[in-house]
UniProtKB/Swiss-Prot annotation:
Molecular function terms from GO: mRNA binding; rRNA binding; structural constituent of ribosome
Keyword annotations from UniProtKB, A to Z: Ribonucleoprotein, Ribosomal protein, RNA-binding, rRNA-binding
Disulfide partners: none
Protein name per UniProt: Small ribosomal subunit protein uS3
PROSITE patterns assigned: KH_TYPE_2, RIBOSOMAL_S3
GO CC terms in record: cytosolic small ribosomal subunit
Organism whose genome encodes this protein: Symbiobacterium thermophilum (strain DSM 24528 / JCM 14929 / IAM 14863 / T)
C-alpha cells in the first residue's frame, strides 16, 4: 500500500519552517524535547475550543517564548488579559522557567488544514453525515481562494462493522511539488463506535506566486495611500491622469525632441 510522507516535513527549509527553534547539547536535548511535547499538549487540551492550529516554541537561555496561532484570540487572552496571564503562570510552574506568551490570529480558519480537520471531527462526534461535513468544508475553502482540497475520513463510519475510508476532493493538490504551499492537518473524532481519523490537505498555490501576490497587494495599497495624500505621479490636485492626458503628454514630448540632421548639406 502506498504511504504519503508528511507534507510539512518534506518542505521544511523550502517553503516551511520549524515549529521548534532552539539548540541544546546531547545531555539536555531529550529533556527539552519532552518539555516541548508537554507544553503543546497542555495548551492544546486547555484551549481546545479556541481553535489552536500551531504552537511555536523558541528557547534562549532560561527563557521560553511560545507563539500560539489561534482562530479565536479573545478566548486565549481572556477578559483584560486574565486568561493569557493565568496560562503563562501555569506554564512557568510546570517548566520552572520564565515564559513569554504571544498570540497570533488566524484570519481565515477555513484555509487552515488543522482547524478544518478538527471542525470535521467535531461534526462527526455530533453524528452529522461525513459526506455533508466534507462537502461543506471543501466548498468554504475553495470559495476563499484555495486551489485544491483533499479530505480522507477513516474508521467505522456511520457505525459500520467494517472500517473503511472515504475521500472527497476538489481542485489539485500536487504533493510531489516541493515549492507548493500545502497545509496538512489531522484530527480524531471520538464516537461511540470508536475513533474516526480525519486527514486534510489544502493547496494554497506555489510559494513564489503567493509572495508575488503579496508584493502586488502592498504596492496597490501604497498607491492608494499616495492617492489619498495627493502623492507623486498624479495630475494636478493629486488626481490620477486620464489616458487621453497621458497620450497628449507623450505626443508633446516626441514633437519637442531632437530633429534629424541633414548630412548631405553638411549641417
Amino acid at each position: 500500500m502506498g504511504q504519503k510522507v508528511h507534507p510539512k516535513g518534506l518542505r521544511i527549509g523550502i517553503v516551511k519552517d520549524w515549529d521548534t527553534r532552539w539548540y541544546a547539547d546531547k545531555r539536555n536535548f531529550s529533556d527539552l524535547l519532552v518539555e516541548d511535547v508537554k507544553i503543546r499538549k497542555y495548551i492544546k487540551k486547555t484551549l481546545y475550543a479556541a481553535g489552536i492550529s500551531r504552537i511555536e516554541i523558541e528557547r534562549a537561555g532560561g527563557r521560553i517564548r511560545i507563539i500560539v496561532h489561534t482562530a479565536k484570540p479573545g478566548m486565549v487572552i481572556g477578559r483584560q488579559g486574565q486568561g493569557i496571564a493565568e496560562l503563562q503562570n501555569q506554564l512557568a510552574q510546570m517548566t520552572g522557567k520564565q515564559i513569554s506568551l504571544d498570540v497570533k490570529e488566524i484570519r481565515l480558519p477555513e484555509l487552515d488544514a488543522q482547524l478544518v480537520a478538527e471542525s470535521i471531527a467535531q461534526q462527526l462526534e455530533k453524528r452529522m453525515s461525513h459526506r455533508r461535513a466534507m462537502k461543506q468544508a471543501i466548498q468554504r475553502a475553495m470559495r476563499l481562494g484555495a486551489q485544491g482540497v483533499r479530505i480522507i475520513v477513516s474508521g467505522r463510519i456511520g457505525g459500520a462493522e467494517i472500517a473503511r475510508s472515504e475521500r472527497a476532493w476538489e481542485g489539485t493538490v500536487p504533493l510531489h511539488t516541493l515549492r507548493a504551499d500545502i497545509d496538512y492537518g489531522f484530527a480524531e473524532a471520538d464516537t461511540t463506535f470508536g475513533k474516526i481519523g480525519v486527514k486534510v490537505w489544502i493547496y494554497a498555490g506555489e510559494a513564489a506566486q503567493k509572495a508575488a501576490a503579496g508584493d502586488r497587494r502592498e504596492r496597490g495599497e501604497r498607491r492608494e495611500r499616495g492617492g489619498r495624500r495627493g502623492g507623486r505621479g498624479r495630475g494636478q490636485g493629486g488626481q490620477r491622469m486620464s489616458r487621453e492626458e497621458r497620450a497628449a503628454l507623450e505626443r508633446a514630448a516626441i514633437e519637442a525632441g531632437p530633429k534629424p540632421v541633414n548630412r548631405e548639406g553638411g549641417q
